[in-house]
């Protein structure tokens, strides 16, 4: 029988983070390392402030390397925060699902608000049925289904909105300075990598499985969020503001058929998450303004 997280008291839980050099992956590594035996992978950029012997260079196309890492680490829990080629990633998740099914280990899969990008008519909670039309959203939803089929209640799916570090926020400002338009009728929810990492640690300690949305308490238009960012960084500039149509929204997602988009009645597009998990909202709910002030 599989162990609950809290059963690992005498023996420290061994965690493997796939994608430990990314925004959320690196925050997870730093957050979890004090309490657990944490290992990570990276592709090009080795994570800062980590133990040299606990990270592995890994190209997701190389399955022999993945098998070697799994045999070396023998993880009780795998947290997937991978990026890269969708087909390769899907194969990686099939491989780790097979490994964890046999070892009775557990998995936390970091998913996205884009599993709902075909229905920008409202915000979506954990009980809503995904409807992706972008390749990215379709891939993430395929991974969710694959892992669920293999692991059932040994899987936690964590769906994330736009999740920022200080570096990410600065890049967004620079893109606007370089002329990238900001959409006034595109609404998003947000979070910070540090807050997400703390919430995931809470989920580990609470033996959580199923689906959770780790998101801000409020939603805000992309242009309003940019105004707050510019004010935070004391930038006084006029930027290009645009408005999505169904056609341009569909095109931005790489979809050729606007008829697939489920439109809202108010002309806005909501790529947002909400949560019905009151304990997570109570402990880790954060406003968009607080997100910016924490960067």
Predicted features and spans:
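N-terminal Rossmann-fold cofactor-binding loop
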Residues: 40-47, 60
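NAD(P)-dependent short-chain dehydrogenase/reductase
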Residues: 145-195
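Catalytic helix-loop patch of NAD(P)-dependent Rossmann-fold dehydrogenases
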Residues: 115-158, 165
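Mid/C-terminal beta-alpha module of Rossmann-like enzyme folds, strongest
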Residues: 199-250, 284-295
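Conserved Rossmann-fold cofactor-binding substructure of NAD(P)-dependent oxidoreductases
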Residues: 57-74
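Amphipathic terminal alpha-helices
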Residues: 2-4, 264-295
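N-terminal Rossmann NAD(P)H-binding glycine-rich loop of SDR-like oxidoreductase domains
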Residues: 13-35
């Amino acid at each position: 029988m599989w162990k609950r997280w809290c059963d690992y008291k005498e023996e420290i839980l061994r965690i493997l983070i796939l994608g430990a050099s990314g925004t959320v992956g690196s925050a997870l590594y730093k957050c979890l390392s004090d309490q657990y035996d944490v290992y990570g992978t990276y592709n090009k950029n080795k994570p800062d402030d980590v133990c040299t012997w606990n990270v592995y260079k890994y190209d997701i196309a190389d399955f022999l390397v993945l098998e070697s890492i799994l045999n070396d680490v023998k993880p009780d829990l795998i947290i997937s925060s991978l990026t890269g080629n969708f087909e390769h990633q899907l194969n990686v998740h099939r491989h780790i699902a097979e490994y964890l099914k046999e070892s009775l280990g557990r998995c936390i899969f970091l998913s996205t608000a884009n599993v709902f990008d075909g229905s920008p008519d409202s915000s979506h909670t954990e009980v809503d049925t995904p409807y992706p039309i972008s390749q990215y959203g379709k891939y993430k939803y395929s991974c969710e289904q694959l892992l669920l089929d293999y692991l059932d209640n040994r899987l936690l799916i964590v769906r994330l909105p736009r999740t920022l570090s200080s570096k990410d926020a600065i890049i967004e400002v620079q893109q606007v300075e370089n002329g990238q338009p900001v959409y006034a009728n595109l609404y998003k929810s947000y979070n910070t990598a540090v807050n997400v990492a703390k919430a995931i640690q809470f989920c580990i300690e609470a033996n959580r499985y199923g689906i959770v949305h780790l998101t801000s308490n409020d939603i805000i238009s992309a242009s309003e969020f940019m105004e707050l960012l510019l004010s935070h960084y004391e930038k006084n500039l006029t930027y290009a503001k645009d408005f999505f149509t169904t056609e341009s929204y569909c095109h931005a997602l790489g979809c050729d058929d606007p008829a697939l988009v489920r439109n809202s009645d108010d002309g806005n597009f909501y790529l947002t998450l909400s949560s019905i998990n009151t304990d997570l909202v109570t402990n880790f709910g954060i406003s968009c303004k607080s997100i910016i002030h924490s960067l």
